Amino acid sequence: MSHSACPKPATARHSQALTGEIRIPGDKSISHRSFMFGGLASGKTRITGLLEGEDVINTGRAMQAMGARIRKEGDVWIINGVGNGCLLQPEAPLDFGNAGTGARLTMGLVGTYDMKTSFIGDASLSKRPMGRVLNPLREMGVQVEAAEGDRMPLTLIGPRTANPIAYRVPMASAQVKSAVLLAGLNTPGVTTVIEPVMTRDHTEKMLQGFGADLTVETDKDGVRHIRIVGQGKLTGQTIDVPGDPSSTAFPLVAALLVEGSDVTIRNVLMNPTRTGLILTLQEMGADIEIIDPRLAGGEDVADLRVKASKLKGVVVPPERAPSMIDEYPVLAIAASFAEGETVMDGLDELRVKESDRLAAVARGLEANGVDCTEGEMSLTVRGRPGGKGLGGGTVATHLDHRIAMSFLVMGLASEKPVTVDDSTMIATSFPEFMGMMAGLGAKIAESGAE
């Protein structure tokens, strides 16, 4: 069932200073992988801080359908895994709802099993191209039956024995890299991924943590060679999932834009492949203090203290895109309140997200009085400090949670209110968003709930 069955519009209004302390729900990338690797490993995995959005729960259900036992006791998720190489053929198609990450990673995980696995998703996910993950799987011997353009619904028919491959990732995509590495788990010999541009590396770090024989070498040109030896043993682990930097972006930018704000955000994942937004905002003049940086489960974590700041426009280097691809919509909101021009380039990946995210952002900005130019792969925003004259529009979210949250943040600081046409799908990644923002003092109301 798609989220648009009964849309719930929401409106954000100019708010007084946002203040308080919050802990962001767990990182989505790490949450997906915790369920997957815990379900695959031998023995018991215990997870705290898991993001309980619909996307991640769908990944958990898929692992259950293939033999993993998953239960929740208090705040802890406990998984009894099947053991590497021992997943069972699911009886029914695996339904991933809106979750591109869950679907693509699971295709890699199960593709090399000698079994038949079918994948389905909601209307939005069924439009998204899966070829980038399916092509390397085909090289490994997997047969694919898919809807036109390598889209879902699709079925994978695994080979008797998969071939290990060396695969050069043609675009900066952590999902493609991860899918090939996961396919390598059940493949004899060494599977290699060659990655010219580094992307988020949670798969590598976590697989090593679960005991996989995985090595990473970076050559003199900065190209990463990631090798995994197949058919090894994975052992259950204890994981405390740090706060999601992509979700952190919304209260963080809101605190920068709403006058007089002072907000502390606890336990945020600071993995260097994910901090592009914080770096960019600091270049724009944002007052973001990084407190108590520490290591947790092999990942960098810190607390952030954010105070309202006067921002100035910057040119964002295109090579930073992989480390902040999900944050461009909310960066565009920050840029709308900055003095001068902000140029964001290298955004081709945004065209194939939950919506054509680049077009959706540009239309939303225009509807709310922002002077912006949309290019083939770029967005240029000319800001209005203080948000004078901004707002007053309704934004088409196209079932995209990040578009909805970004424009609700805009309405907190713009002169006139901003309305989004639907807010139900925010639950896919950040179910606590509305309550958490209200707790800081944000004026956001679902329409009809004034």
UniProtKB/Swiss-Prot annotation:
Molecular functions per Gene Ontology: 3-phosphoshikimate 1-carboxyvinyltransferase activity
Statement: the UniProt record of this protein carries the keyword Repeat: no
Catalytic activity: 3-phosphoshikimate + phosphoenolpyruvate = 5-O-(1-carboxyvinyl)-3-phosphoshikimate + phosphate
GO biological process per UniProt: amino acid biosynthetic process; aromatic amino acid family biosynthetic process; chorismate biosynthetic process
Keywords, comma-separated and alphabetical: Amino-acid biosynthesis, Aromatic amino acid biosynthesis, Cytoplasm, Transferase
Positions bound to phosphoenolpyruvate: 28, 100, 128, 175, 357, 402
Recorded GO CC terms: cytoplasm
Associated pathway: Metabolic intermediate biosynthesis; chorismate biosynthesis; chorismate from D-erythrose 4-phosphate and phosphoenolpyruvate: step 6/7
EC code(s) of this entry: 2.5.1.19
Protein task: Catalyzes the transfer of the enolpyruvyl moiety of phosphoenolpyruvate (PEP) to the 5-hydroxyl of shikimate-3-phosphate (S3P) to produce enolpyruvyl shikimate-3-phosphate and inorganic phosphate.
PANTHER family: AROM/DEHYDROQUINATE SYNTHASE (PTHR21090), PENTAFUNCTIONAL AROM POLYPEPTIDE (PTHR21090:SF5)
Family affiliation: Belongs to the EPSP synthase family.
Record protein name field: 3-phosphoshikimate 1-carboxyvinyltransferase
